[in-house]
A protein has these predicted regions:
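Single conserved hydrophobic/aromatic residue that forms the stacking wall/gate
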Residues: 1-13
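Conserved catalytic-core segments of large NTP-driven translation/proteostasis enzymes
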Residues: 7, 15, 31-34
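Structural motif
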Residues: 13-15, 17-21, 70
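ATP-dependent carboxylate-amine ligase
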Residues: 23-28, 34-188
Length: 188
């Protein structure tokens, strides 16, 4: 499986190329498509049917939607929900960009007694993956920015984060926004 054009992938199965279209970003989503293909192939054994069904299916855009944003920057909107694993997958995606990478992250809710530790792990992971800046919003996101270090900035209110983004974002930035549903991160 490899990328061909924007939002298109090409699969080579049994010496046949199949064009598929998907709005989904990230290696983990491509793996999900491949596992769906294997299931479909075992049940139907018609390679072309899978591509037709996938290409005609409108996947509800709620995860990792890529678009142009403030001042010509690139936005990856992954505001639908967050947990430690999905946040790390999003960080993996963001880390593949060569541009200046900015993670805007809100609290990951409903994590129980290990919530602070799990938030810190996400900050450490972002640092290890080479993310340039982490902007945190929410009480628990402070753990992420502290674990990230010097270029981790915590915001305790919506207006200060919005103001920072408007003032500091450039066309060379790739910004990924992520947070639990309850944080309503899409407002940024």
């Amino acid at each position: 499986l490899h990328n061909t054009l924007r939002r298109q992938r090409q699969m080579c199965i049994r010496d046949r190329d199949i064009q598929i279209k998907t709005s989904l970003e990230g290696e983990h989503n491509i793996k999900n498509i491949l596992s769906s293909f294997v299931t479909h192939y075992c049940l139907d054994n018609n390679i072309n049917n899978f591509a037709l069904k996938l290409n005609s299916n409108k996947i509800k855009n709620v995860r990792q939607i890529k678009s142009k944003w403030l001042k010509g920057s690139t936005l990856i909107d992954d505001t639908y929900n967050a947990n430690p694993d999905s946040s790390k997958k999003s960080i993996d995606l963001l880390s593949k960009y060569k541009e200046n990478t900015i993670l805007v992250i809100g609290d990951m809710l409903e994590l129980g007694k290990f919530k602070k530790k799990l938030h810190r792990e996400v900050g450490e992971y972002a640092k290890a993956k080479g993310i340039n800046v982490v902007l945190g919003y929410g009480k628990l996101a402070k753990e992420i920015t502290e674990a990230f270090g010097r270029k981790g900035i915590f915001f305790n209110n919506e207006d200060s984060l919005k103001s920072y983004l408007k003032k500091n974002i450039t066309s060379k930035d790739v910004i990924l926004i992520k947070g639990s549903r309850g944080m309503k991160m899409e407002r940024f």
